[in-house]
C-alpha cells in the first residue's frame, strides 16, 4: 500500500470544535513559542477563552462550520476513485481527524509506504514542520514499519502554477479586474527573523505568477491576512490594501490549497465591509480536477 496523507491545520466542523481548535493551535510550540509546556498550556487557555466566542460568531456566518474537512474528504474520495496506485486520506493538526486515529485505520508493514503531503505550497515551521513532526512522532509511537516519504514545498511546480493561472483567468473572464491581489496568511515578523523561509517562498511564488500573468493585469499586490495580537506581522495587511484601493480587484489566496474560514469568512465576508473597492475572490484549488492532476503527477514523479 502507498498511503498518502494530506496534512493541514484543520477547520472546526461545529461550534464546539472552535475551542478545541484554538486550544490546540496556541498550545503548539511552533505557534506560541513558549518553551515551558505548562506555561504555554496556561497561556493557550487564556487566549482560547478570550477568542472562542468571536470565532464561534464568525463560524455562524459560514453556517456553523469550516468547509475545509468536507472539501479535503471530497478530494480524497475523488482521488481514490480515479486510480488505485495510492490510497488517500487526511490528518488535521488541531481538530479531528487526528494522526492517532487515522494511522490506526490502516494495517501497514515494512513493504508499505506512507507519503506525508502537507497542503501548504510554501514552507514554514508553523505549518509544514509542525505537521510533519506530529505525524512522524505518531508513526514512531505506533511502531509503524512502513517507509515514510515527505513532501515539502511545491510552489515552483509548473503544473501547479498552470492550474492557478487557469483558475485566475477563468474568474477574470467573469469579473474583469486589472488588479490582482495575492493574499497570503501572515506570520509574526519575529518568526521570519529567526530564519523561517515562508516570506521568501511567497515572494518567489508571486514573481513566478506575475511573469505568467503580466499580459492580463496592470498591477499585482502581495498582502498578508489574519494578523493576531499586538506584535509586528508581515505587511501590508490585506484589509488595509482593500480599504485604500479604488479600482476593481481580484484576490487569489496564494498560501491556501483548501478553502477555510480565512478565505470564506475573512476574505469573502469580513473584508467586504472594509473595502472601498469592488473585488471578487478566487477559490482555492480544493477538489478540482486540475488540482488532482497535479497531485497525481507530483506523486508519480517521486517514484
From Swiss-Prot:
Reactions listed under catalytic activity: heme b + 2 H(+) = protoporphyrin IX + Fe(2+)
Major location category of this protein: cytoplasm
GO cellular component, one term: cytoplasm
Residues binding Fe cation: 185, 262
Broad class of enzyme this protein falls into: lyase
UniProt cross-references to InterPro entries, sorted A to Z: Ferrochelatase, Ferrochelatase_AS, Ferrochelatase_C, Ferrochelatase_N
Disulfide bridge partners, by residue number: none
Alphabetical keyword list: Cytoplasm, Heme biosynthesis, Iron, Lyase, Metal-binding, Porphyrin biosynthesis
CDD domains: Ferrochelatase_C, Ferrochelatase_N
PROSITE patterns with a match to the protein in the record: FERROCHELATASE
Keyword Metal-binding: yes
Protein's pathway: Porphyrin-containing compound metabolism; protoheme biosynthesis; protoheme from protoporphyrin-IX: step 1/1
Any GO MF annotation of the entry: metal ion binding
Subcellular location, record wording: Cytoplasm
GO terms classed as biological process: heme biosynthetic process
Enzyme Commission number(s): 4.98.1.1
Pfam families on file: Ferrochelatase (PF00762)
Transmembrane segments: none
Recorded family membership: Belongs to the ferrochelatase family.
PANTHER family: FERROCHELATASE, FERROCHELATASE, MITOCHONDRIAL
Function: Catalyzes the ferrous insertion into protoporphyrin IX.
Protein name: Ferrochelatase
Organism of origin: Campylobacter jejuni (strain RM1221)
Lineage, uppermost ranks: Bacteria, Pseudomonadati, Campylobacterota, Epsilonproteobacteria, Campylobacterales
Amino acid at each position: 500500500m502507498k498511503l498518502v496523507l494530506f496534512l493541514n491545520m484543520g477547520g472546526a466542523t461545529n461550534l464546539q470544535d472552535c475551542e478545541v481548535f484554538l486550544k490546540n493551535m496556541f498550545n503548539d510550540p511552533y505557534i506560541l513559542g513558549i518553551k515551558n509546556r505548562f506555561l504555554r498550556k496556561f497561556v493557550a487557555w487564556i487566549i482560547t477563552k478570550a477568542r472562542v466566542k468571536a470565532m464561534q460568531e464568525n463560524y455562524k456566518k459560514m453556517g456553523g462550520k469550516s468547509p475545509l474537512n468536507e472539501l479535503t474528504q471530497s478530494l480524497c474520495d475523488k482521488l481514490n476513485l480515479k486510480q488505485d496506485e495510492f490510497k488517500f486520506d487526511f490528518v488535521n493538526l488541531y481538530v479531528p481527524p487526528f494522526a492517532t486515529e487515522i494511522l490506526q485505520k490502516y494495517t501497514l508493514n515494512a513493504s508499505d509506504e506512507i507519503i506525508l503531503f502537507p497542503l501548504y505550497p510554501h514552507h514554514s515551521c508553523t505549518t509544514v514542520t509542525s505537521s510533519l513532526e506530529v505525524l512522524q512522532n505518531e508513526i514512531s509511537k505506533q511502531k509503524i514499519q512502513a517507509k515514510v516519504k515527505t513532501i515539502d514545498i511545491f510552489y515552483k511546480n509548473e503544473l501547479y502554477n498552470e492550474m492557478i493561472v487557469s483558475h485566475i483567468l477563468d474568474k477574470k473572464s467573469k469579473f474583469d479586474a486589472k488588479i490582482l491581489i495575492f493574499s497570503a496568511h501572515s506570520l509574526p515578523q519575529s518568526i521570519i527573523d529567526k530564519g523561517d523561509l515562508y516570506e521568501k517562498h511567497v515572494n518567489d511564488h508571486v514573481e513566478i505568477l506575475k511573469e505568467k500573468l503580466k499580459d492580463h493585469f496592470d498591477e499585482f499586490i502581495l498582502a498578508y491576512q489574519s494578523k493576531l495580537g499586538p506584535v509586528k506581522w508581515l505587511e501590508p495587511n490585506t484589509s488595509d490594501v482593500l480599504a485604500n484601493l479604488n479600482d476593481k480587484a481580484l484576490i487569489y489566496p496564494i498560501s491556501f490549497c483548501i478553502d477555510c474560514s480565512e478565505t470564506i469568512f475573512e476574505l469573502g465576508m469580513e473584508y467586504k465591509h472594509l473595502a472601498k473597492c469592488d473585488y471578487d475572490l478566487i477559490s482555492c484549488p480544493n477538489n478540482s480536477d486540475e488540482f488532482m492532476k497535479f497531485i497525481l503527477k507530483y506523486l508519480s514523479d517521486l517514484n
